[in-house]
């Protein structure tokens, strides 16, 4: 008799995705972040669901309802801080996951990569709308500044912004719709994750060497299930340390002041995970140019398969490309730092140089150095 997990229509899907899935024998801990992202999404949906039971999406009571969750709801404080810091963990895992894809050439799986970019945009949109919900000063002004960027679109810009706001400024209608979308999007993300995995399982996983490993595969369970559990425990340790010891470390103190349309905070800035894109936006003195650069800073990832000029897939055996990759990482950290600084000398020029370097590395220098490496190897 066939094992039920291999014959039952429902169990068969789970079996083929998580148990009997053939996986390369050489994948390192950099391949852990996919499962960690799944765990992050689960944590966010669960904590978000319980927070939504106590939250009110009304400008008069939103801030108060978050205070009520922290003070009066049983374990409300831990739900709120798990959700807020869970978003930070989500983005740390996302950036490492994308970085892994860039380093090891995973972007040659075109469908998986493109769905991944869609997921990145969806998660960023969800996080932005979630930041607006507590209705603190930074929530209100962040929403005002970022939605206002759409007014740079020719002809339809102003109408589009007013349509998103549901009025002539960020107000009650805006908060209500942001809550609705913030609740809905994670489920769309979960569906996109299924599509992401569907495309991945069509090709099988990449590995650090970038060489096809079809002749050397091992079952996902128990080898990689136990490895994923270890990764999950490490992430849980970091997340719980953040939540229990310094829950406000990554937040902005301005968000503990209720939203006031009549008083602008001295420095309007988004959460830390958007600072690199915010720095690129601010580095261009033109509004439309800034918006385009902001979108392209993420969308440029879609060009990676076209910009791959090397004869090798992975950077594992390409030291020159490795140098440029780590320069790109350092550049992104510089942009993140600049995004949190005021717009004054010397931060303006540093931001502009870092933005130029970011696009130059991806669009020009990395493809060129790959061609040089091909010649050095006489390929």
Swiss-Prot record:
Transmembrane segments: 33-53, 77-98, 113-133, 178-198, 226-246, 288-308, 320-340, 347-367
Residue sites binding heme b b566 per the record: 97, 196
Pfam hit, one: Cytochrom_B_C
SUPFAM superfamilies (alphabetical): a domain/subunit of cytochrome bc1 complex (Ubiquinol-cytochrome c reductase), Transmembrane di-heme cytochromes
Membrane-protein topology: Multi-pass membrane protein
Example GO molecular function: metal ion binding
Swiss-Prot/TrEMBL cofactor(s): heme b
Keyword Mitochondrion: yes
Protein location: Mitochondrion inner membrane
Binding site for a ubiquinone: 201
Main location per the UniProt record: mitochondrion
Domain of life: Eukaryota
Additional information: Heme 1 (or BL or b562) is low-potential and absorbs at about 562 nm, and heme 2 (or BH or b566) is high-potential and absorbs at about 566 nm.
Subunit structure: The cytochrome bc1 complex contains 11 subunits: 3 respiratory subunits (MT-CYB, CYC1 and UQCRFS1), 2 core proteins (UQCRC1 and UQCRC2) and 6 low-molecular weight proteins (UQCRH/QCR6, UQCRB/QCR7, UQCRQ/QCR8, UQCR10/QCR9, UQCR11/QCR10 and a cleavage product of UQCRFS1). This cytochrome bc1 complex then forms a dimer.
Function: Component of the ubiquinol-cytochrome c reductase complex (complex III or cytochrome b-c1 complex) that is part of the mitochondrial respiratory chain. The b-c1 complex mediates electron transfer from ubiquinol to cytochrome c. Contributes to the generation of a proton gradient across the mitochondrial membrane that is then used for ATP synthesis.
Protein name (database record): Cytochrome b
Species of provenance: Megaloglossus woermanni (African long-tongued fruit bat)
